[in-house]
Amino acid sequence: MSVLTVPRQTPRQRLPVLPCHVGDPDLWFADTPAGLEVAKTLCVSCPIRRQCLAAALQRAEPWGVWGGEIFDQGSIVSHKRPRGRPRKDAVA
C-alpha cells in the first residue's frame, strides 16, 4: 500500500474560491428564472468566468448557468421565462 502525500499550500498558492463550488450546486440548474438570475449574479465576480463560458460552449451544454450566461436547450438566452401558458400575442 502506498501513501499519497500532498504538499501544503501557502496562502499564495491556494486556488480561488469559485461561486459555483460553495453553497447549493443546484442553484446553477434552477427551475425558476429568479434562481437562475441569482446564479448569474454570483458569476460576475468569478475569476474563471470567461474560461467557464468557453468550455460550456465547446461542450455544447444543454442547460444551466455557465460563465454567467443562461443556457436553455443548448443556446444562450438573456433570461428564462417561467413555466406556464404561452403568450397570447405573437412575438415579432
Swiss-Prot record:
DNA-binding region (UniProt annotation): 80-91
Keywords: 4Fe-4S, Antibiotic resistance, Cytoplasm, Disulfide bond, DNA-binding, Iron, Iron-sulfur, Metal-binding, Transcription, Transcription regulation
Pfam family, one: Whib
Localization per record: Cytoplasm
Post-translational modification: The Fe-S cluster can be nitrosylated by nitric oxide (NO).
Cellular component aspect of the GO annotation: cytoplasm
An annotated GO BP: negative regulation of DNA-templated transcription
Inactivation phenotype: Decreased resistance to macrolides, a lincosamide, and an aminoglycoside antibiotic.
A single MF term (Gene Ontology): dinitrosyl-iron complex binding
UniProt: [4Fe-4S] cluster binding residues: C20, C43, C46, C52
Induction of its expression: By sublethal doses of antibiotics such as erythromycin, streptomycin and tetracycline as well as the fatty acids palmitic and oleic acid (in clinical strain 1254). By the antibiotic erythromycin. Positively regulates its own expression (in strain H37Rv).
Cofactor: [4Fe-4S] cluster
Cofactor note: Binds 1 [4Fe-4S] cluster per subunit. Contains 1 [2Fe-2S] cluster after reconstitution of overexpressed protein from E.coli. Following nitrosylation of the [4Fe-4S] cluster binds 1 [4Fe-8(NO)] cluster per subunit.
Keyword Transcription recorded: yes
HAMAP family noted in UniProt: WhiB
Entry function: The apo- but not holo-form probably binds DNA. Acts as a transcriptional regulator. Probably redox-responsive. Upon overproduction at least 10 other genes are up-regulated, among them are Rv1258c, Rv1988, Rv2301, Rv2416c, Rv2725c and whiB7 itself. Probably redox-responsive. The apo-form has been shown to act as a protein disulfide reductase.
Family membership noted in the UniProt record: Belongs to the WhiB family.
Entry protein name: Probable transcriptional regulator WhiB7
